[in-house]
Every structure is written in structure tokens, then in C-alpha cells.
Amino acid sequence: MTNIVQGIIDSMVMHNPFMLPLAPVYKATENSHPAAVTMMTAWRTITEAGEPSLLAIDTTNGTAYFALDVSEGDDAKKTVLRGRVKVVDRLITELELFMNRNRGDHGFSYSAIELPANYAELMSPPANRTKASREYLYNLSDALFSSTNNLSVSVDDDCQFTELGWKVIDTGVYGNASSDPLGCSWPDDHPTDDNARVALVVDEELGFVVTSGIIPGKVYPYQNVSAFIPNRMTSAQEAQDVWVKETEAEAEITVVSPFGATGDTLEVLQYYDGKLQAMQINVYLSGPNMTSPWL
């Protein structure tokens, strides 16, 4: 599986999708829209890429998830490439790709620069760790976007929280909140998706589990940038509504108008030693009332 993932990446750099071991009939999407790999942007624009910074492999399901920074010609402004692949009899039957180029693609966060170092920590867990069972990792994935699974999850004090490679710092719209990176949390009030794709990749060795959820929300102005806030996070949206009214009344800065949006999310969790060790929220935004072709 490692060789197949690296082969996908190498074929992009070589601009040669024909070298991929595709099944006679395969499913493929790029940034949520279906396309033949021969028509995808990744094979046209990526000029440099190395090995995955994060690689989760599910030997039972024949699936893998990978993420890394890639160059599309400008090494100073790299792109985050994320992908999920399914293999049957050494042939690719499913390929789900996302290319995030800046903060707006995700909704707030992004750092292709920080990604390699942050993800490297997760690829080298302690050798003496207590691994979670496949059944528990599945249940963890099921609970992530569930409205009925009330799994209680312990969070490690050093749990790494990232969004698109970035250890998120949020000083708030008034600029007076903490400048320390945010930590992980397992809140009771979280975005839900009853049609979430659960346990797409379960890596029992490293403790990774990958889940997909389609999350409706709204893009709000946020200081001089913008932020995607899921509809389920009502208090956060209400607070932002207040700030928007204050800002409009003061008329001191220009802000983007609020818009409805949908977050296509591939979330990665890492769990071992009986605690959540890492949480990665990876989103690609589209318009309101959208869904996924994988459903």
C-alpha cells in the first residue's frame, strides 16, 4: 500500500496518470467533484512532492489516507495534498483527493509550512504504547459526527490539534484571546452528520481512524479574514452576528459578507494509551446545501 500511495504522488509530479494501476472501473473525485484522473488538476500542476508526511494504512479494508505539502511551481507557497485510496487485488478502485491552497479553502486554518513537522510527531508514537482495538477505533469514528453515539473520550494533555497542518491560534475577533495553540477537545455539542462515512481508514498500528462528514455552516467575517462556523455551533454563530453588527456600525474596516457554505470534512483522529492523542480537522469548502458524490 505504501508503494501504491507513493506511486500516486510520483505520477502527479511526472504528469502521467496513465502509470497508475487503476481497476477497469474506478471511482475518483478531486475537491469533491468526480473526474477521470486524466482530467484532474493535480496531474497538471504539481511539480514537486516527496513522501507523505502522514500515512495511515488499513490492511483489513485495503485503504489508506495520506497528506503532504506539494509544490505547484512556487516553493514559497505550497499546497496541501490529501487523499484516500482503496485498493483491491493491487488495483485502485477508489481515489478521493483534496488540494487546499490557502486558508479560504478550509474556512480558517492552513499551513503547508508547519504540516511536515507537526505530522511527523504523529508518525512516531511511543514504542511501549497500548494500542486501541479495531472495534474501539471504529466506535470512536462512529461517535465523531453522531447525534446518538455519546461515547466519552479521554483527551491526552499533549493531544495535538491541527487544521490543515496548522496548530491553530485563535486570538478572537477582539484580539484579546490566547495566542497559544488550541488544544484538542471532545465536546458534547459538535457538528453532526447522520450520513457520515465512518472508519474509512482504520490503522490499528498507529492508532489512526479517518471519518468523513458533510457539515453545513456559514462563512463569517472574522477580524480582517473569514471563518467557517458550522450551523450546529449556534453560540459561536450568534457571537459572530453581534460582532458583525458592531463592525458594520463602526465602519472602520472592510469585511466580507456572511455566506452559507458546506464543509466536506475528512477528519483524522489518533488514539492510543486510552486517550485521544491527535485531532486533525481537514475541510474543503463548497456552496450551501451541498453533499458528497461518495454518498
Indicate where each model-derived feature is located:
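C-terminal and inter-domain tail/linker signature
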Residues: 1-295
